[in-house]
UniProtKB/Swiss-Prot annotation:
One of its GO terms (molecular function) is guanyl-nucleotide exchange factor activity. It comes from the Eukaryota. Residues 334-343 have a biased composition (Polar residues). Promotes the exchange of Ras-bound GDP by GTP. SUPFAM superfamilies: Ras GEF (SSF48366). Residues 1316-1549 form the Ras-GEF domain. Pfam families: RasGEF, RasGEF_N. The keyword Translocase does not apply. GO terms for cellular component: plasma membrane. It comes from Dictyostelium discoideum (Social amoeba). This is Ras guanine nucleotide exchange factor K. GO terms for biological process: Ras protein signal transduction. Keywords: Coiled coil, Guanine-nucleotide releasing factor. Residues 1-121, 146-181, 195-238, 283-347, 558-619, 881-937, 1254-1303 are annotated as: Disordered.
Length: 1557
């Protein structure tokens, strides 16, 4: 009768010594008798093969189909060509260690016979399949069971070939090929002793095997061959210790790697039982060569030594759990299975298994993502006055306050209190003297200072927040809203509670290197946290104490008292023994020796007692959790606290529990080198707790609620995610020595709220600044912060408020992210009202300006700032408060009167000029604003406003404009406040008639515009080396003598040649050539009108043209008309192409001349010129207004950068068709019409000096105006300037040529590198082209950009381009140095090189060279490890860029590249500035004393004309506003030295590769 076969269990195998491991193999030619082994041994081997090779989606392993067939006896004369295998193979099927291989022909079954039972292995797979041990499991599982051989002679196995049974497949894909294992199933679990008893039984090979009753056995067709006889084998009895743990899998031992694999012999197959089907690997490993030794000694039979009982208990419990799970899974499988076919799974189960197997392996990057922190949370705050305070003088409140606030979820409770309490004081009438103490408490103090000083230490009231759900427990003030799990619309109660202070001593052992201890006295209350005390101890003792492993411990006093008593008793015994020894010393030496021995024993006892005392102290001490409060542990003044390191014994206890996670924390900081700190955590700890522990251990005490853990699966900062603070560390499957970046996740912004007109905490209505703090992550926009402030401050008109960076004055745009602004610590932002516009008149020159002022500031402060912003300075002697100053046409104006701050005083050089009555009617040209020099004895002037049309000034300069009732856009006049002595002196200076005018000036040129052409004037101009031109008597242009070497020099030797170029000539000769009636030289006219401002003024040129127009009567009529027509055409071209040259005075002269002369001679041409003037002044410039104020003509300033709105044709046509006359009234009507049109146009003023705040546009007040002035004539077809490219609609044909915008990263961008490189280059090009087209030709003259005194006034756009070029260069350096890891820096460098290459393709050479300049900065060039990670592709791109943009040979390669580039182009502005500098410095302005070097201006014109030709063709690109927000303001506060220092921190000098990577 054949014994019953029970399913295998985890049998503890006999484990031989590693040195004696061996296997017995036989040669293929040997015919030995098969010594069969026990069936259960082989089944155990197969069962373990299944258990040691689990199939999972992450590591699929092959499956095997074992089919059970009756075995036949094999004779010893079996000489067929069969392979022999020892039935004692290791690891179930084939030896070989970690991976065993099954070698068989494809689609052929393998039969193995043992003890009368035949096992058929059927494969539908390639010849060799690895038995893979999946990751996460022990690789030494193959050594669990070692086959024990009873005989060294293997048995031959017959090989037959049968077709494999059909295997159910899911689809035709390769993954449907499976390898199945079919075994008997049994729910009964035999004991270990039963299994060993079965090994001793003799198997009957002729009888069929009886399966268990619960197994569904199909009919089996026995093969024709006979089975071999078997020999019983013996097994030793198990030790007694295994009786309890009969179902435990013992630890496995690894097998030696030298054991070769063994082939399996094929046999016939039979019908199968129920099977488990698992997927095959896609690509099997190639078969290794088989080497079978001739003689291998058999393995000895040994049992492993019994493991400790503690480990056995743990293993036993684990094994029971596994068995229960397996039984539950089997029951589920049996209940789910409906039908079986050939032992396979149902189609539904197979489909499910296929889906699981096809899933990719799970990684932290796929399973975890950064948790989105909500940007805001709304909470309802209720305040109830405390009964103890409401009756006294400490707190006064009308009623209970209930208000809804919006907070940042990252803010702590203490920061919430800093928002609520001042808000209640300011808006809700909460009148109390609450102060924020150094202990982060909001204490309410007494109104009476005497009462406050006499109060005891416990007499303190503090504000605290309580959750309405638990009103008796105050909220932890150091925890954030996220940590407290608060939700929207939750109710918090604000109360005042009495503070109870406690003083306790904290012992600090081993305070210094000499192991001296110290004692610190700590003061705390019921709200004080353990962490705050550790922070204070660190700040005080960080030089003496290593805080990285420190904590506060509470010592149990009871155990200490017992230890002390024991020590005292031992000491008394020792003293007694010592006395006895001394007394008996002279009597008996033997007694002395005995006593000494006793003393030694006592001393040893004392030492042991001390050790026990330390151990008891460690065991009795409790480490105080840093998250908790002192009140949680009931700490009082008698508590014994110790501030010490965590002992080694505690570490050993933690390590023995196997619950320690050792992590490497990478500390990231902006201006410090990254440090790595090894910390140990309990995997069950929350991420929030680990973050705060890290903050304390690293000393970054202010970063506890701002930093977080950033986990990167790779070494790239940009591909990681933030760990969720609510989860535990073990949920992330972290391994030991995993790198975590500890860096800033939230930035703490301090908001300064500037509000006036309300009652503050002090009871008055003065303007106050209140501070509140918010924390925001990188995904928070400015609009979120703005809406929070609007809600909390109860603002009804949010359009009147904005946010401004305090340090730079930059206005924050609402659609941008807060982190996109480079706001430096302490991250202060001002929340205040928009400064409103005010129309200011300058009574000296009639200048009128729309300026932005703060209506809440005192008027004297506003006036003091505005007095320095006008284009022409206020004449401090001419502005008077008396109305009797203008009685006569010719007044005596003494600019050096006593008491005034005139220009120079006694030390100034006076230059006196006599003028006739006509000279007093003309106004001076606006000059650079300069404050008069201050003299010690001269009183500084102060100013105020005065309403127009009022005789007496009713405005109080000490109050604000809002308090005076001044409304926005009101017109006021700036007036000087003078004392009585000044007024009296001014009255005495205005009583003489027909007196000479004396003007005292200092470093000021004589204004040639105020003198007629027939008078003698001082002609000054700065030339090379600062010399001044000699005086010249200017004569009428019709009186200019004939050509001679004294007034004209031609480029050729032939004189009077009309076509010859002029090298030098007088001004009259140049104008004669300009208006030559015989021929027209267009190049000469362009050169002259572009460069005339270098040697004359607009007013002088106008007067000379007027002289040329007034032809003498003796000239022929035809010649007269030709000359006049040529003058009219020159004026028309001048107005059309150089309208920015005309100021108020020159425009007035032009209008008067057109109305009085040109409308008579050429009416049609006169109307065209008037229309050009209107088109250029209306909408492009501010309005021209003729208003009488103290007899002066008022007008707006002229050097303004304005955004314009084009006039409609009907308005222009109506003005052009108005009747003209020669009277002054017609001029007034023209100016009035101009005013009426321009009032409706939108103005955006940007002053060149004075006010520090940026220019504010009416539509987008936060963005600076970058609207360039187009050099194109307004009548041309391309009249739309390049600045309107972002605004003007394009035609369908133009839209079709615009490339599609690449929207990568538009959804939720964190930084600039979230966008596509090509799209970044496009947006940079659009912005730079906008700046480039704004350059005026006159900005390149006289090297104005290089002269600080006139640069901001003469060349403002060039300065902007130069500043942006330098900003981009430093910006690139900061972008590369920003990442902490070297691989991320290399990635940033690759992206920047790619952007530079795209800029070159777009012909944006200016920004391309700026980027290359940043890459070649010394702070980047020294980063050898960063550059070493660049691939050859990017190195070649960078090399080509550097070669093309090299400055060698005066930028020869770049000039060739630019010449061959098709527009649109943004050229490198530095090359043009260099060329102009060489021209200016290498050629004088004046030669031969009074001849203008016109050949020099030919060269200048050629350079400027080349610049202008690239301003005409515009880029056809779409604007991406979200990218523009990142590239608009690239200025950083760090200097080159700061960036170089940061580079040294990132990669120190002589740093090793291991230190960087």
């Amino acid at each position: 009768m054949e014994p019953t076969i029970n399913p295998p269990v985890n049998l503890p195998p006999p484990v031989p010594s590693r040195s004696n491991l061996s296997l017995n193999y036989s040669n293929n030619n040997t015919n030995n008798t098969n010594n069969t082994n026990n069936t259960n041994d082989f089944k155990k081997k197969l069962q373990f093969q299944l258990q040691s090779s689990p199939s999972s989606p992450s590591s699929p392993s092959p499956s095997i189909i074992y089919k059970k067939t009756p075995a036949v006896n094999n004779n010893n004369n079996n000489n067929n060509n069969n392979n022999h295998i020892n039935n004692g193979n290791v690891n179930g099927i084939g030896p070989g260690g970690g991976n065993s291989y099954i070698s068989s022909p494809q689609s052929s079954p393998i039969h193995t016979s043992s003890n009368g039972i035949s096992y058929t292995v059927t494969t539908n797979s390639p010849p060799l399949l690895p038995v893979d041990n999946s990751s996460g499991y022990n690789n030494n599982l193959n050594s669990t069971f070692v086959e024990t051989l009873s005989s060294s002679s293997p048995s031959p196995i017959k090989t037959t070939t049968t077709p494999p049974p059909p295997v159910p497949s899911k689809s035709k894909s390769k993954s449907s090929e499976k390898l199945s294992v079919k075994l008997l199933k049994s729910n009964s679990k035999p004991s270990l002793n039963d299994l060993y008893q079965q090994q001793q039984q003799q198997s009957n090979p002729n009888s069929p095997t009886t399966p268990p009753s619960n197994c569904n056995i199909e009919s089996i067709q026995p093969p024709s061959s006979s089975s071999s006889s078997t020999t019983p084998s013996t097994s030793p009895q198990l030790p007694a210790i295994y009786s309890k743990y009969s179902k435990i899998s013992l630890p496995q031992l690894p097998l030696p790697p030298f054991l070769p694999p063994s082939p399996l012999v094929q046999s016939t197959s039979s019908p199968s039982f129920s099977s488990l089907i698992l997927p095959l690997p896609s690509s099997p490993l190639p078969p290794p060569p088989l080497t079978i030794p001739n003689k291998v000694p058999p393995l000895p039979m040994r049992l492993p030594p019994p493991p400790p009982p503690q480990q056995l208990d743990q293993m036993y419990s684990n094994n029971n759990q596994q068995q229960q799970q397996q039984q539950q899974q089997q029951q589920n499988n049996e209940s789910n299975s409906t039908t079986t076919s050939e032992g396979g799974l149902t189609p539904e189960s197979e489909s499910k298994l296929y889906e699981i197997a096809s899933q990719p392996p799970s990684t932290p990057r796929l399973t975890h993502e950064s948790k989105v922190i909500p940007s805001e949370i709304e909470l309802l705050i209720k305040f109830y006055p405390s009964p103890s305070l409401s009756s006294g003088s400490l707190l006064t409140i009308p009623s209970t306050i209930e208000k809804s606030f919006i907070f940042s979820p990252c803010s702590t409770v203490d920061e919430i209190l800093s928002i609520i309490i001042p808000n209640f004081q300011f808006h809700n009438g909460l009148k109390c003297f609450a102060k924020h103490t150094f202990n982060n408490e909001w204490e309410a103090t007494h109104n009476d200072p005497a009462a406050a000083s006499s109060s005891i230490i416990d007499d303190h009231e503090s504000f605290a927040l309580f959750n309405q759900k638990s009103p008796t427990i105050p909220l932890h003030k150091e925890k954030t809203i996220l940590e407290l799990s608060l939700h929207d619309r939750d109710v918090l109660i604000l109360k005042t509670v009495s503070l109870v202070f406690t003083l306790v001593k904290v012992q600090i052992p081993h305070f210094t290197e000499n192991s001296l201890s110290a004692t610190a006295t700590v003061k705390f209350n019921q709200f004080t946290s353990i962490r705050s005390i550790i922070r204070k101890l660190y700040l005080k003792y960080h030089n003496n104490v290593d805080i990285s492993r420190h904590g506060i411990f509470l010592i149990n006093d009871n155990n200490n008292n017992n230890n002390n008593n024991n020590n005292n008793n031992n000491n008394n015994n020792n003293n007694n023994n010592n006395n006895n020894n001394n007394n008996n010393n002279n009597n008996n030496n033997n007694n002395n020796n005995n006593n000494n021995n006793n003393n030694n024993n006592n001393n040893n006892n004392n030492n042991n007692n001390n050790l026990h005392q330390q151990q008891d102290e460690l065991s009795s001490s409790i480490q105080l959790e840093e998250e908790e409060l002192f009140s949680t542990y009931n700490i009082n003044s008698n508590s014994n606290l110790v501030f010490r390191t965590i002992s080694n014994q505690e570490n050993d206890i933690l390590n023995s529990s196997q619950k320690i996670l050792n992590l490497k924390i990478l500390i990231s900081s902006t201006f410090s080198r990254n440090n790595t700190l090894n910390l140990m955590f309990d995997p069950r700890d929350s991420v929030s707790k680990a973050i705060k522990v890290t903050g304390l251990r690293t000393g970054l005490l202010d970063s506890l609620n701002k930093c977080g853990f950033y986990l990167t699966p790779s070494e790239d900062d940009d591909e990681g995610f933030w760990m969720d603070e609510e989860l535990t560390l073990e949920m992330y499957n972290l391994k030991n020595h995993t790198f975590l970046s500890f860096k800033e996740r939230c930035k703490k912004y301090t908001i300064l709220i500037k509000m006036g007109g309300a009652s503050n905490g002090n009871g008055n209505g003065d303007l106050t600044w209140r501070k509140c703090t918010f924390k925001f992550d990188q995904f928070t926009k400015v609009s979120t912060l703005f809406n929070i402030l609007i809600n909390n401050e109860n603002i009804k008109n949010p359009k009147d408020y904005h946010l401004v960076v305090k340090s730079t004055g930059t206005s924050l745009e609402k659609h941008r992210y807060l982190w996109s602004y480079d706001i430096k610590s302490p991250y202060e932002i001002e929340f205040k009202e928009y400064p409103n516009k005010l129309l200011i008149f300058n009574p000296q020159n009639g200048e009128k300006n729309f300026v932005y002022v703060d209506f809440n500031e005192p008027i004297k402060d506003v006036c003091a700032r505005l007095s320095q912003t006008f284009s022409s300075p206020i004449d401090f002697g001419s502005i008077s408060t008396n109305n009797n100053n203008n009685n006569n046409n010719n007044n005596n104006i003494n600019s050096n009167s006593n008491g005034s701050s005139g220009a120079g005083g006694a030390n100034s050089n006076a230059l006196t000029s006599s003028t006739n009555s006509a000279s007093t009617t003309s106004s001076s040209t606006p000059t650079t604003p300069e404050l008069p020099p201050q003299v010690n004895h001269v009183r500084e002037r102060s100013y105020t406003f005065k309403r127009l049309g009022q005789l007496n000034n009713t405005i109080d300069s000490r109050k604000s404009l809002k308090d005076q009732g001044v409304l926005p856009n009101d017109a006021l006049m700036l007036e000087v406040i003078q004392d009585d002595s000044i007024a009296t002196n001014n009255n005495n200076n205005n009583n003489n008639n027909n007196s000479n005018t004396t003007t005292t000036i200092k470093d000021k040129k004589i204004n040639r515009n105020s003198l007629p052409s027939s008078t003698t004037m001082v002609f000054e101009d700065l030339v090379k080396d600062g010399t001044i031109l000699s005086e010249e008597r200017q004569i009428n242009i019709w009186d200019e003598p004939a050509d001679s070497n004294g007034n004209i020099i031609y480029s050729k030797t032939v004189t009077n040649n009309l076509n010859a170029e002029i090298d030098a000539a007088t001004l009259n000769k140049l104008i004669i050539r300009l208006t030559n009636p015989v021929f027209h030289d267009l190049t000469f006219m362009k050169t002259f009108l572009m460069t005339y401002s270098s040697y004359t003024t607009t007013t002088t040129l106008l007067k000379k043209l007027f002289e040329r127009f007034q032809v003498p009567t003796h000239i022929d009529e035809r010649e007269r008309l030709s000359a006049q027509l040529r003058v009219a055409n020159v004026i028309k071209y001048w107005v059309e192409h150089h309208y920015e040259d005309f100021c108020h005075e020159s425009t007035k002269l032009m209008v008067d001349f057109v109305d009085t002369h040109m409308m008579i001679a050429f009416p049609t041409l006169g109307v065209q010129i008037r229309n050009c003037i209107l088109k250029r002044t209306c909408g492009f410039k501010s309005e021209l207004v003729r208003t009488r104020s103290n007899g002066a003509l008022t007008s707006p300033r002229t050097n303004l950068s304005l955004s314009f709105t084009n006039l409609n044709n009907s308005s222009v046509g109506s003005i052009a068709n108005t009747s003209s006359s020669t009277s002054t009234s017609s001029t007034s009507s023209l100016l009035s019409s101009t005013n009426s049109i321009s009032i409706s146009s939108s103005l955006s003023l940007s002053f060149n000096s004075g006010i520090n705040s940026p220019s504010i546009s009416q539509n987008t007040p936060s963005s600076p105006s970058l609207i360039p002035s187009s050099p194109r004539p307004i009548t041309s077809s391309s009249s739309v300037s390049s600045s309107t490219l972002l605004k003007s609609p394009l035609s369908q044909q133009a839209k079709s040529r615009i490339p599609e915008t690449k929207t990568k990263g538009f959804a939720n961008p964190r930084n600039l590198f979230d966008f596509d490189d090509e799209e970044i280059a496009r947006q940079l090009t659009l912005y730079d082209f906008q700046l480039y087209t704004a350059i005026k030709p006159t900005e390149f003259l006289n090297q104005a950009w290089n002269k600080p005194s006139m640069a901001s006034r003469k060349s403002p756009t060039i300065l902007k381009i130069i500043s942006r070029f330098n900003d981009i260069s430093l910006w690139v350096v900061s972008l590369i140095l920003e990442p902490d890891r070297v691989k991320t820096r290399a990635k940033r460098l690759k992206r920047i090189i790619s952007i530079a290459d795209e800029l070159r393709k777009l012909n944006n050479y200016n920004t391309c060279i700026a980027v290359i300049s940043g890459i070649n900065n010394s702070a980047i060039l020294r980063l050898k490890y960063t550059r070493g990670l660049l691939s050859k592709k990017y190195l070649d791109i960078l090399e080509n860029l550097e070669k093309e943009m090299s400055c060698e040979g005066s930028y020869k390669n770049y000039r060739d590249k630019l010449k061959n580039s098709d527009p649109p182009v943004v050229p490198y502005i530095g090359v043009y500035l260099t060329d102009l500098t060489f021209i200016e410095e290498g050629n004088p302005n004046i030669i031969r004393g009074n001849l203008i070097n016109f050949a020099k201006y030919y060269l200048i014109y050629r350079v400027i004309s080349e610049i202008q030709q690239y301003q005409w063709t515009e880029y056809q690109l779409n604007v991406a506003p979200i990218i523009q927000t990142f590239i608009r303001d690239v200025s950083i506060s760090s200097t080159s030295d700061d960036l170089y220092h940061l580079s040294l921190l990132k990669e120190p000098r002589n740093a090793l590769k291991s230190d960087i990577f």
